[in-house]
Amino acid sequence: MIRLQRITTADTDLYSYMEKLMTQSFPSEEYRELEELRKYTDTKTHFYNNIIFHNNSPVGLITYWDFGHFYYIEHFAIDPAQRNGGYGKSVLNHLCQLLK
């Protein structure tokens, strides 16, 4: 079962997992400076930094913005060891249901 968990920098292990996956999955010019990302995660109430879980094991990350009238997915990555298992499709379906 897919589950999203919003995180902050206080969730040290999960936040470290997210930063590692972010830096592995995207070129540095495609994500904010990590210090800025930490600030956004902790202070921007309409920014959602989430770990994706499947059966209570982390399998990826998804960040998005809630602008009231629409949502904007900023980053979405599945852990390389978990890719090609259908998680991407499952996450997008789950998110569509969640944000209806």
Please give the residue ranges for each predicted region.
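Conserved beta-strand in the GNAT
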Residues: I51, S57-W65, F70-A77
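Active-site rim helix/loop that mediates acceptor-substrate recognition in acyltransferases
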Residues: F26-H54
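Short amphipathic alpha-helix that is part of the acyltransferase structural core
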Residues: M1-E36
